[in-house]
Amino acid sequence: IDKTEKCDSYTSDNLLGAAYVSADFNYSDKLNTNIGIRAEYYNLKIDGYSTDGLTPVNIDQKNMDIFPSVNIAYHLTDKNLFRVAYGRSVNRPEFREIVPYVYYNFDVFANISGNIDLKKAYINNYDLRYEFYPTAGETVSFGLFYKDFKNPIEQTYHEAGSGVQYTYHNADRAVCYGIELDIKKNLSFLG
């Protein structure tokens, strides 16, 4: 006997269309800039039922977003440069985070429910890097990064009956920062 309930399934359509344009500006042998802009049209449709199986849930989100980027490089020598960059990006809710149904997650031994009120998160990304190119195909770079999130999506939990139930919410703001070291070394000398 099939015991599938209306609230156990949903249908969805996801459309993302994008266009990107950029321009390079070389002010001198030492200083160059790349400026870009990305436009995205996003349409998300979800049809299903709330967890009671009685209330239809229809989501139809249409958005147009603009994401600028700027990358400035200053060449100290032909093998050394400093780079500063900015870019804006987005983190859209995944289907499982936004659909109005409950599923059991065996990794955390708890039910997880979606949240139809989730907003997308916008991220402003800032980078500062020093790059060194000792030989062709080799790179050493050291960087600092800072990311500022608006409406980040977080998993939260609450007591539900005899256990815990997880869901997703938007926090107001979050930041992430750190350092990066990247080394690309040609190992052809090993044979």
Could you describe each region identified by the protein language model?
Residues 59, 112, 169:
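A short acidic, glycine-rich active-site loop
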Residues 19-25, 31-39, 68-76, 80-88, ...:
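Membrane-embedded beta-strands that build the outer-membrane beta-barrel scaffold
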Residues 43, 78-125, 144-166:
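Surface-exposed extracellular loop regions of Gram-negative outer-membrane beta-barrel proteins
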Residues 9-11, 41-49, 60-62, 90-96, ...:
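Gram-negative outer-membrane beta-barrel proteins
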